[in-house]
């Protein structure tokens, strides 16, 4: 059995640290992609009293949030109109991505005789989603004047927040400042938000009315310098499994597909029942590390869909079937932390955590 153990205390402490750091700004907690792999229902249930909003990528994720909490939920992605009636009935906040969305939403709202809560996503330089910057003011004005829309927020997203000195950050901030000025001229109550985790850490002055700290809430810090108080934030989860079999190699034998790992006579291998079918990175095979009884052991051979093997050498520490295996550590400096695994596999911590799938049990402790 593979379990992602999540520390409720660490999670809540992370959020409290962030809230203190951002001052009076509201906190919108992103829980998309199954709460970055941590389990959306459990995360929402244990944080709803600490945050102002939750944010997700699509309608189906939003329904999972509203099933366990009453906080406002913002959907970042495009509007799936097949779900729009339920979204409106549950007061889920939609993101207007194009001027044309306004008329479509108005027509549906009229039919339901219920207003739609909306945030307008403005493309200030990410060039992925959102209303074109040059059309922003017209779209904001139109939505604000609508009898069927409640324009609750206006937002954008930073493209290069992980590089605090990138010139695009200033360009996007300047553009967003002009949008904020126009928006606040209509109403001071409209929530303006730009910053993800690395955005407000790189430049505290861009918190505006609300911030969206996703990866930071789960305990992952940027590589650039941040204030000492932020350094108290810790990863909230450990991925654990068990040794299910010990194998002793004979002379000339190997292990796994294509037998790319060739051991020595008498070498012992531990079989762990987790693989890329669980969302664990296949690239770790033959180069990753696991922790068994406070000793690091290297993976041996290719990772399979449902299992991996590690070399115990001569097994001088007497690893046994049933021993606990730590696959992902909550200590960033460890060789099996999400940070270290991301470096080994040329990716980011978001990827390592969010791809862990539902074959892995989530447990809040």
Swiss-Prot record:
CDD domains: PLPDE_III_AR. GO terms for cellular component: cytosol. It catalyses: L-alanine = D-alanine. Substrate binds at residues 128, 305. Keywords: Isomerase, Pyridoxal phosphate. One of its GO terms (molecular function) is alanine racemase activity. InterPro entries: Ala_racemase, Ala_racemase/Decarboxylase_C, Ala_racemase_C, Ala_racemase_N, PLP-binding_barrel. Pathway: Amino-acid biosynthesis; D-alanine biosynthesis; D-alanine from L-alanine: step 1/1. The active site is at 32 (proton acceptor), 257 (proton acceptor). Its EC number is 5.1.1.1. The keyword Nucleus does not apply. SMART domains: Ala_racemase_C (SM01005). The modification N6-(pyridoxal phosphate)lysine is found at residue 32. One of its GO terms (biological process) is D-alanine biosynthetic process. Its cofactor is pyridoxal 5'-phosphate. Belongs to the alanine racemase family. Catalyzes the interconversion of L-alanine and D-alanine. May also act on other amino acids. This is Alanine racemase. It comes from Francisella tularensis subsp. tularensis (strain WY96-3418). The lineage of its organism: Bacteria, Pseudomonadati, Pseudomonadota, Gammaproteobacteria, Thiotrichales.
């Amino acid at each position: 059995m593979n379990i992602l153990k999540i520390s409720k205390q660490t999670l809540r402490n992370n959020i409290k640290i962030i809230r203190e750091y951002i001052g009076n700004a509201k906190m919108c907690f992103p829980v998309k992609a199954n709460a970055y792999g941590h389990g959306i229902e459990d995360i929402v249930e244990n944080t709803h009293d600490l945050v102002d909003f939750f944010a997700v990528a699509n309608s189906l994720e939003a329904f999972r949030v509203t099933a366990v909490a009453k906080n406002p939920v913002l959907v970042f992605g495009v509007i799936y109109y097949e779900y729009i009636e339920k979204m409106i009935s549950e007061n889920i906040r939609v993101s207007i991505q194009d001027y044309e969305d306004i008329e479509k939403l108005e027509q549906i709202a009229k039919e339901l005789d219920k207003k739609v809560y909306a945030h307008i996503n403005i493309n200030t330089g990410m060039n992925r989603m959102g209303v074109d910057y040059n059309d922003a003011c017209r779209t904001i004005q139109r939505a604000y004047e609508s009898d069927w829309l409640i324009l609750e927020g206006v937002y954008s997203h930073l493209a290069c927040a992980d590089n605090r000195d990138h010139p695009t950050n200033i360009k996007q901030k300047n553009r967003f400042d002009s949008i904020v000025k126009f928006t606040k001229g209509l109403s001071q109550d409209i929530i303006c938000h730009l910053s993800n985790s690395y955005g407000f850490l790189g430049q505290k002055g861009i918190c505006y009315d609300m911030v969206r700290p996703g990866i930071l809430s789960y305990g992952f810090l940027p590589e650039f310098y941040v204030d000492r108080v932020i350094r108290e934030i810790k990863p909230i989860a450990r991925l654990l499994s068990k040794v299910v079999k010990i194998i002793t190699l004979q002379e000339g034998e190997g292990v796994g597909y294509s037998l790319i790992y060739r051991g020595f006579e008498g070498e012992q291998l531990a079989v762990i029942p987790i693989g890329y079918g669980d969302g664990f990175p296949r690239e770790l095979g033959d180069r990753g590390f696991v922790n068994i009884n406070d000793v690091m052991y290297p993976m041996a051979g290719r990772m399979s869909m449902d299992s991996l093997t590690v070399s115990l050498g001569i097994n001088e520490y007497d690893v046994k079937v049933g021993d606990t295996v730590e696959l992902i550590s909550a200590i960033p400096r460890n060789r099996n932390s999400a940070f270290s695994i991301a470096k080994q596999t040329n990716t980011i911590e978001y990827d390592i955590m969010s791809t862990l799938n539902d074959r892995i049990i989530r447990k809040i402790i």
